[in-house]
Curated annotation (Swiss-Prot):
The keyword Ribonucleoprotein applies. This is Large ribosomal subunit protein bL28. The gene is rpmB. The keyword Ligase does not apply. Signal peptide: none annotated. NCBIfam families: L28.
Length: 85
């Protein structure tokens, strides 16, 4: 499933509304991008949404660790494993 590995942002479903106000179900997908983070000295490729990527852009390793620890409840299991090393 498409989900940001840091914030947990995933699919959102709702209605698409036409000009005549006819409702059809649709799904909004997160804008996921693959980026490399340095966690505990080792590079890791992660899928993050564009908003998270904007936050991480230009962040030092210390700031990245602070962001990861702030979102510990929504981190993927793979990131949790690297964080606990």
């Amino acid at each position: 499933m498409q989900r940001c590995e840091i914030t947990g942002t995933g699919l959102i479903s709702g209605n698409q509304i036409s000009h005549s106000h006819r409702l059809t179900r649709r799904v909004w997908k997160p804008n996921l991008q693959v980026t490399t983070l340095v966690v505990n000295g080792s590079p890791i490729k992660v899928k993050v949404c564009a908003r998270t990527l904007k936050t991480l852009k230009g962040a030092s390793e210390v700031e990245v660790m602070r962001i990861l620890k702030a979102n510990i409840a929504t981190l993927s299991e793979r990131l949790l494993k690297h964080l606990n090393k």
